[in-house]
Amino acid sequence: MKSSDLLLAANTLWVVVAAVLVMFMQAGFAFLEAGLTRMKNAAHIAGKNVLIFGVCSLVYWAVGFGIAFGDGNSVLGTSGFAPSVDSLLAVGQAPYSFFTTVPGAAGYLFEVVFAGVSLAIVWGAMAERAKLWVYFVFGAAFTLIYSVTSHWVWGGGWLFGLGMQDFAGSTVVRRSEERRVGKECRSRWSPYH
């Protein structure tokens, strides 16, 4: 085995392990949310988190990954929507040339679990306050917002061009949430100002 193949395997293994660890955060946030609500809603919360992660995964596969990491401009990616298995197995090739040290599938897995966990952070504030369809709509919209923000920082966007580095994702995850909450607050408060 060549050293480059060994390095690729090690990088891929590490990214997949990290993605699995981030996925476990979903369970942690579900437990936190269940602990903050009445006991009769605990099963509803667990099921909701699984369903919304599914919605997030589908939206991120169909549109979000292309917006975040597809070739495009400094605001959003304009290619690579609904990636095929073959395109995700390539390393460092268009439209996902951002992933130069791991296959696109490993990068996709890592990014989709981050999009899902950023949604789970928000759900704690919405527990017992919304109907199930609201979670679906909010989850799809938030996944798109997360995709745009991740393109700005990680996908070669305008913040990346300014030299911004975000290794752990705190800027992308938190700023996506803040933009969404800001839009909601502005729409509710604007008639009163």
Q: Locations of the language-model features?
A:
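Hydrophobic alpha-helical transmembrane bundles of multi-pass membrane proteins
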Residues: 1-183
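Positively charged, low-complexity/disordered segments
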Residues: 182-193
